[in-house]
Amino acid sequence: MPNLLEKTRKITSILQRSVDSLDAELPYNTMAAQLADIIDCNACIINGGGNLLGYAMKYKTNTNRVEEFFETKQFPDYYVKSASRVYDTEANLSVDNDLSIFPVETKENFQDGITTIAPIYGGGMRLGTFIIWRNDKEFSDDDLILVEIASTVVGIQLLNLQTENLEENIRKQTAVTMAINTLSYSEMKAVAAILGELDGLEGRLTASVIADRIGITRSVIVNALRKLESAGIIESRSLGMKGTYLKVINEGIFDKLKEYN
């Protein structure tokens, strides 16, 4: 049976691995599963707004309402507000506690249900909450040491996620700005008309039709599309006589165009 040191090493080793795809609906599912396995419990990670980032159900709780939280990926406001007022780990909360993960209607079925809440901090900010629970067995002192370490590790990963998201947004904004600055007045006019033709972020268009409607040459539209594609703003594919298929992959172009209108 792994001892405390071995379990601690397993948790800290999580920092050496990346989270699931940041585009995934639950980017921290794998991490939650690893922590649940190490601490021997059910676990979930929510951000400051109560959005579910990842969870692992090692043991069946038979609570439909809790499982609904996981399906909608959003915890109720009253619970999020209560959890946000927890500044230090609250351990071994009974089913009668307001912070218990076990709904009131199932108290009789899980009279020995235990919940532990740990705040997640990173860079001096509250980033979320780490929630673990068991159907009966209390969390020992060793378990709680692991919880403290786990919440710190999750905090570091959440901070990394925020940094990566910020860097990605800056990269996209920079790409849009540089692309816009290379466009002539006519090309800017063409881009606005092209994006207005799309059904959301993608669609089919005919360059000659757009050119005739806004009073520019087809070559202007072709040049504008080429510049946007080389900047990673759009993807395009010729459909032959049917026109061109277009997909926007950097949505920042829409906001940038509004600034020029």
UniProtKB/Swiss-Prot annotation:
One GO location term (cellular component): cytoplasm
UniProt keyword terms in alphabetical order: Cytoplasm, DNA-binding, Repressor, Transcription, Transcription regulation
Region: GAF domain, residue numbers: 1-159
Statement: the UniProt record of this protein carries the keyword ATP-binding: no
Annotated GO biological process: negative regulation of DNA-templated transcription
DNA-binding region(s) in UniProt: 207-226
Annotated SUPFAM superfamilies: Winged helix' DNA-binding domain
Molecular function GO terms recorded: DNA binding; DNA-binding transcription factor activity; GTP binding
Top-level taxon of the source organism: Bacteria
Predominant place of localization: cytoplasm
TM ranges: none
CDD domains: HTH_ARSR (cd00090)
InterPro entries assigned to the protein according to its UniProt record, in alphabetical order: ArsR-like_HTH, CodY, GAF-like_dom_sf, GTP_trans_reg_CodY_C, Transc_reg_CodY_N, WH-like_DNA-bd_sf, WH_DNA-bd_sf
Compartment(s) of residence: Cytoplasm
Biological role: DNA-binding global transcriptional regulator which is involved in the adaptive response to starvation and acts by directly or indirectly controlling the expression of numerous genes in response to nutrient availability. During rapid exponential growth, CodY is highly active and represses genes whose products allow adaptation to nutrient depletion.
Family according to the record: Belongs to the CodY family.
Name this polypeptide is given: Global transcriptional regulator CodY
